Amino acid sequence: MASKFKEGFKEQKAKTNANMQKFFEDTVRFRSFFTCLVLAALLVGIVSLVISLVNIDRNSTPITTLPSGADGNSANFTEGSIADVANKVTPSVVSIVTETSVQSFFGESSGQAAGTGIIVSKDGYILTNKHVISSAKNIQVVTSDGQIFEKASVVTTDPLNDVAFIKVDASDLKAANLGDSKTITAGQQVVAIGNALGEYQNSITSGIVSGTGRSLTASDGSSISSAEALTDMIQTDAAINGGNSGGPLINAAGEVIGINTATTSNANNIGFAIPISSVKGMLKSVLETGKGERAYIGVRTISITPEVATAYELPVKAGAYVYSSNKYTPIVKDSPAAKAGLQEKDIVTKVNSATIGANGSLSSLIGEYKPGDTVQLTVLRSGKTMTINVTLDAYKASDNSKN
């Protein structure tokens, strides 16, 4: 009986490997050809400055990298624990391969791209980056043990962030444990897992949190209009490569604290991840309704830094300052903020017990809640501190607000 079981296992493993090889065959050939072109360009001295979601414009991103020995308040890895964390989380990480239409001088043709996803429910909901699945004609998902789902569907995308949820028909997947990104600190050790370069599934890298609250502009390189401003990002020196987009950034407890999103090709060891807490509200909405909506309050703010505080003569050096511009009013009409009585020049310092600045931006902290939830804002107005309860609504594209 044991002999038959081993033979059956070997046969099944061989079939799985064959399926995986066939699945990535076209992608490998395409990337091999593309790699040759890139090497040829380098030999003649061409330096590419194209910004993409894996190529960040450094001029728009103030970066300060901490030394690898920096102290953090969270638990760090011990010898062997990186492998333990990787073994714990890898079953919850999937590879994503998309088929897209490519327009050229010769007409329309098909292309392939690859990314990574995080399983967030046993019945097949998967979290990834929006840019991984945008414009895809077909989405295929491969689990860490080689199971292939030929057609995944897009459930929803975040209108304000590079986040998407997709769904496969499953009933017994292993969901990842999600941590609290509000408590991470610079110097804390982390692990990244992903489908590196679209060819090396379940690649493991490690590093530290180099900084938090980073802002940057990213694009998939297809057009100027594809550029997207990303705020409140986690900076890490854990290696993040093309194909890692949508994969998890993990703490020493084996909890997902970020979604790996971007890196830069013109500097080493600089990658960025979206804080996981900022997508928990949409996740709750997805799991409860099967649709997924982003919560918002409808107020236009600027994050307060010491420089902003000086420029606007503000009494605090952190928080969210409600301001107007020539194009937009400070409070969206009929929004939750308007109904709650928020005003221009208010300074929001807390969302419930979370402090804006130390624990994240206003937008990021609101992202932890779903439409219909009520949050308590701590507000500084004309030198007086008050609390205002706001019942969140679902974001609408016409609202023109990031919060």
What kind of region is each of these model predictions?
Residues 381-383:
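Surface-exposed loop/turn motifs at beta-strand-loop junctions within extracellular Ig-like
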Residues 126-127, 334-360:
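Conserved PDZ fold ligand-binding element
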Residues 132-134, 271, 350-378:
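PDZ domains, with a preference for the canonical peptide-binding region formed by the helix
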